[in-house]
Amino acid sequence: MQALTNPFPIGSSSLIHCMTNEISCEMLANGILALGCKPVMADDPREVLDFTKQSQALFINLGHLSAEKEKAIRMAASYANQSSLPMVVDAVGVTTSSIRKSLVKDLLDYRPTVLKGNMSEIRSLVGLKHHGVGVDASAKDQETEDLLQVLKDWCQTYPGMSFLVTGPKDLIVSENQVAVLENGCTELDWITGTGDLVGALTAVFLSQGKTGFEASCLAVSYLNIAAEKIVVQGMGLEEFRYQVLNQLSLLRRDENWLDTIKGEVYE
């Protein structure tokens, strides 16, 4: 894809602050390490700013939200906004939780670099009809035409922010560009935390100076292409999970991996 340039080798071992849930915490930490950066996970309000101030990117994931974690999230997001620290917000569960949806809308005032979610979550957030249950997307919510138009309008309201919408076809929308990407495999939906991992990888690429649009395209494509290489081998679910990290660490050695991205970028 001509609009993207290879981010590897990683130029500096950036510190990525992930405020995420306990379920996917280990996967995110190892995924960040596999790309050559360093993870830290701190969500106690008493120390959250100490770690955020040392970081080169911030990833906020709303899984397992609590009152204390919400306080820490708001503190970190405020600092990121004031210091121009790249920030990714993953709108997990906004289809079900009014508390999470309200928090995400408040976080928009802190101007995240990337707002991420699955098709159902983003449709819910922008006020479109959706069928999402829990934290999962519905197959009924994969229509992108109406969503694309609304996201273009939101990008004008929140200039500088990109939307990363995951699904069978991944949609990335910024003020001036739209990407529709088609790599991936259904096996990624069978293990928990892969969606969260996309957000963490987006933060990694943001820490290397990529724009929100570029970082989103790179992150979702990198994970999807790594997974495609595993599926070719054929294996059980636990082995597939194990091999995800292997391929994340190996794919960056392939100087031509960008050539395997399937999709289009529109100006």
Swiss-Prot record:
Record pathway: Cofactor biosynthesis; thiamine diphosphate biosynthesis; 4-methyl-5-(2-phosphoethyl)-thiazole from 5-(2-hydroxyethyl)-4-methylthiazole: step 1/1
The protein's required cofactors: Mg(2+)
UniProt EC number: 2.7.1.50
Domain of life: Bacteria
Catalytic activity annotation: 5-(2-hydroxyethyl)-4-methylthiazole + ATP = 4-methyl-5-(2-phosphooxyethyl)-thiazole + ADP + H(+)
The entry's keywords: ATP-binding, Kinase, Magnesium, Metal-binding, Nucleotide-binding, Thiamine biosynthesis, Transferase
One GO BP: thiamine diphosphate biosynthetic process
GO terms of molecular function: ATP binding; hydroxyethylthiazole kinase activity; magnesium ion binding
Binding, ATP: 116, 166
Positions of substrate binding: 41, 193
One matching Pfam family: HK
InterPro entries: Hyethyz_kinase (IPR000417), Ribokinase-like (IPR029056)
Classification via CDD domains: THZ_kinase
Residues in the signal sequence: none
Classification via HAMAP family: Thz_kinase (MF_00228)
Family: Belongs to the Thz kinase family.
Function: Catalyzes the phosphorylation of the hydroxyl group of 4-methyl-5-beta-hydroxyethylthiazole (THZ).
Name of this chain's protein: Hydroxyethylthiazole kinase 2
